[in-house]
Swiss-Prot record:
This is Shikimate dehydrogenase (NADP(+)). Belongs to the shikimate dehydrogenase family. Coiled coil: none annotated. Keywords: Amino-acid biosynthesis, Aromatic amino acid biosynthesis, NADP, Oxidoreductase. It comes from Helicobacter pylori (strain J99 / ATCC 700824). The keyword Oxidoreductase applies. GO terms for cellular component: cytosol. Transmembrane segments: none annotated. It catalyses: shikimate + NADP(+) = 3-dehydroshikimate + NADPH + H(+). Involved in the biosynthesis of the chorismate, which leads to the biosynthesis of aromatic amino acids. Catalyzes the reversible NADPH linked reduction of 3-dehydroshikimate (DHSA) to yield shikimate (SA). It comes from the Bacteria. One of its GO terms (molecular function) is shikimate 3-dehydrogenase (NADP+) activity. Signal peptide: none annotated.
Length: 266
């Protein structure tokens, strides 16, 4: 049986559960796919050229995580779907010798909220302005939520302004129903915002959501302490991964089937 290689680019990357859940799917569906896929973590130096690495490794597809999603958008031969709007790519697929970029974060995040029966008619504050934040802002706006973005610097905020989001470099004196940590602070065991400011937001919120997964982050720990409903990024990971797997399988395996397999192993 033919072997195809896949992977996930990131820095850091050793924490990623993507290899676990994707390899479970490749093993489960190898008969339907007609090939055996192997998916591995790829630690990418910050200065690396993503497209060169992809081709050099002979990959058929890959996911992209921190901090490369915006750079991945720039190196694709083609961009499809909502990735065109959010200028962020988390899924790369080699199609007819062209590197095609997709974004499954936006829909993956929405499906994870829907899974928790979260209501759409509310407002959200996104902390951070990177590739994940862009995808979430696009996705949430499509679902009718009012989106605000708080970032420590002006870098990247012009995108959100063009999108119609309220943008801040200092914490706004407003209340938000959904507080999303889309920064990398949790990977460094830090809060994304001053603790007292974050407490104030949490006390007025209905859900605290951290894109990090696999451990109780300082962000989620504070929400738990204040008895605020909270959620980590596990469901989003599995939903976006199952949507990516559908792309890797050339739509032979619906994301719903991939989701069930991935959920069973993580």
């Amino acid at each position: 049986m033919k072997l195809k290689s896949f992977g996930v680019f990131g820095n850091p990357i050793k924490h990623s559960k993507s290899p676990l859940i994707h390899n479970a799917c490749f093993l489960t569906f190898q008969k339907e796919l007609g090939f055996l896929g192997h998916y591995h973590p790829i630690l990418l130096p910050l200065e690396s050229r993503i497209k060169n690495e992809f081709l050099h490794l002979g990959l058929s597809g890959a996911n992209v995580t921190l901090p490369f999603k915006e750079r991945a958008f720039q190196i694709c031969d083609k961009i499809k779907g909502i990735a065109l709007e959010c200028a962020s790519v988390n899924t790369l697929v080699l199609e007819n010798d062209e590197l095609v970029g997709y974004n499954t974060d936006a829909l993956g995040f929405y499906l994870s909220l829907k899974h928790q029966n979260y209501q759409n008619d509310q407002n959200a504050l996104i902390l951070g302005a990177g590739g994940s934040a862009k995808a979430l802002a696009c996705g949430l706006q499509k679902q009718g939520l009012k989106v605000s973005v708080l970032n420590r610097s002006a870098r990247g905020l012009d995108f959100f302004q063009r999108l119609g989001c309220d943008c801040f470099m200092e914490p706004p004196k407003s209340a938000f129903d959904l507080i999303i940590n889309a920064t990398s602070a949790s990977l460094h065991n830090e809060l994304p915002l001053n603790k007292e400011v974050l407490k104030g937001y949490f006390k007025e919120s209905k859900l605290a959501y951290d894109l990090a997964y696999g451990f109780l982050t300082p962000f989620l720990s504070l929400a738990k302490e204040l008895k605020i409903p909270f959620q980590d990024g596990k469901d989003m990971l599995i939903y976006q991964a199952s949507l990516s797997f559908e792309k890797f399988s050339d739509s032979q395996i619906p994301y719903s089937k991939a989701f069930e397999v991935m959920r069973s192993v993580f």
